[in-house]
Every structure is written in structure tokens, then in C-alpha cells.
Design a protein with these regions (language model features):
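Extended, subdomain-level signal for the structured scaffold at the beginning of enzyme domains
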Residues: 1-67, 78-88, 99-149
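Short, hydrophobic beta-strand segments that form beta-sheet elements in well-ordered domains
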Residues: 71-74, 91-95
């Protein structure tokens, strides 16, 4: 499946699926990152309402694993919105357009470019992707106990 970016129309190809992933395989991941922009809206689409979309089911499973670092940037919070319990009471940031969504999910909107709340890293916009990525890399090194190169 190929997605195309909204602004620059850059292709993003998905060759693998998270559907049917075993718990052991899921636990083998150090981190998962929810993409920004319209792709997160598309990923939350379900053909069988009220059943949540496969991507939402995957996100719920990933959030249940404290050993997996979760990253959500910008409009990526759209993918979390069908599962508000995942961020309820947690400090997050998202695109300013999603402020109402974040509050309605019960999360604590924090006016910072990047916010870390335990195993969850959120960033305001795609323009903060370098800070977001650096934070995730730093946390992965910290968790591994390895020295940074």
C-alpha cells in the first residue's frame, strides 16, 4: 500500500502488515512511531463499525507494552482518538488544530514542542520532527544502557 504526503505528495510505501502480529513479535520492537498528517486519519478507518480499525487495535496493543517507546507527532493523535483511554491523564502535545480533540480524550495538553510522559513521546508538528526524532533516539539509548556514539 502506498500513501502520498499531503503537501509534497512524497510516497510512503508499506510492505508489511501489523495485522496478525504475535505478542512476541510486537514485544521485539523497541519503539513505534505514529506518522503525522492525513495518513493517521486514513489508518483509523474501519469498514466494520463499531469495530476499531486494525491500526487502532495495533496501537492499543502497543500501548499495553511499557517496554515499547511510543511516538506520536502532529496529527498522529488522530489515530489515538478512537482509543482515548491510551492518553487519558497523560501529558501530550499535538498540532494546535487538535487541541480540542486532545482535551476531549482526557489528556493534558502541554504547550511544548516535544513532551515525554513515561513511554510516550509526542511532538507538536512535523516542523519539530528533528527534536522528536532526537528525543526518541536519546530515550532508546537511555533504555538500552549503551553509550551514544
Amino acid at each position: 500500500m502506498t500513501f502520498y504526503g499531503h503537501e509534497y505528495k512524497a510516497p510512503f510505501e508499506c510492505r508489511e502488515s501489523f495485522e496478525g502480529m504475535s505478542d512476541g513479535e510486537l514485544r521485539s520492537y523497541d519503539a513505534i512511531v505514529v506518522p503525522s498528517a492525513i495518513v493517521s486519519d486514513r489508518l483509523r478507518y474501519s469498514e466494520k463499525l463499531p469495530e476499531p480499525a486494525p491500526a487502532v487495535q495495533f496501537i492499543r496493543r502497543a500501548f499495553a507494552e511499557p517496554g515499547i517507546l511510543k511516538g506520536v507527532i502532529c496529527h498522529g493523535m488522530w489515530l489515538i482518538s478512537p482509543a482515548p483511554e491510551l492518553v487519558r491523564g497523560r501529558r501530550v502535545v499535538a498540532h494546535p488544530n487538535l487541541y480540542g480533540d486532545v482535551v476531549n480524550m482526557g489528556a493534558v495538553y502541554t504547550d511544548e514542542d516535544v513532551v515525554v510522559d513515561g513511554d510516550l513521546v509526542t511532538a507538536r508538528t512535523g516542523g519539530h520532527c528533528h527534536q522528536f526524532a532526537r528525543t526518541i533516539v536519546d530515550l532508546l539509548y537511555e533504555r538500552s544502557g549503551e553509550a551514544r556514539p
